[in-house]
Amino acid sequence: GLRAPDAVFVSAGDGVILAGVHKGFADLVSVGLISSMPRLFAVQAETSVVIHRYVQTGVYSDAADPTTVADSISVSCPSNAHWARRAVLETKGATVTVSDDEILEAQARLLAMTGVFTEPAGAAAFAGLVKVQAGAGALPKDAEVVVLATGHGLKDIDAPLARVKIPPAIEPTL
């Protein structure tokens, strides 16, 4: 049969994509196409951590006023928080929080390494992988990992443009 990846990293705001990925893999297991579920990692911006807190504590509470460069995952009341929590726990995954700087660095690195220009919210998933890989023993070095880099970079261009240094104009001298 087919083989699922060892881990999948998903940017999480409302938790809808994460819950959908969980359902998709669960369906593949139920029909016998894969034998096991990948670990699902929900990645959230440090300032928008409702799902992260819910997974960690088991207590749900809305966020006051989440703000982040990754506006697509800046959510005060996630519509799918319960299913997202279930997805992480049932797959023995984890939640990861990343800073705006880590998100923007991941966005630039992803573009330089692969040519994929994703919005900051999509780059958060890659930032989560980078953070987990830097930790001790979270994922084996030979793990097969999928990163869902959702949303085109042109959808949210202001944050990456702020990091671009435009060279000064040179006046013609001829």
Where are each of the predicted segments found?
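Active-site/ligand-binding loops adjacent to catalytic centers
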Residues: 2, 27-117, 162-174
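Glycine-rich ThDP/TPP pyrophosphate-binding loop and its adjacent helix/strand module
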Residues: 3-16, 20-23
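Conserved acidic residues
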Residues: 6, 40, 143
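Short beta-strand segments
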Residues: 10-13, 41-44, 147-150
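Short glycine/threonine-rich catalytic loop with a Thr-x-Gly-x-Asp
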Residues: 12-16, 80, 114-122
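Buried hydrophobic packing segments
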Residues: 17-25, 107, 125-132
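Short helix/loop capping segments that flank catalytic or ligand/cofactor-binding pockets
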Residues: 19, 51-52, 156-158
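Phosphate-binding loop/pocket of nucleotide- and phosphate-handling active sites
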Residues: 35, 62-64, 124-174
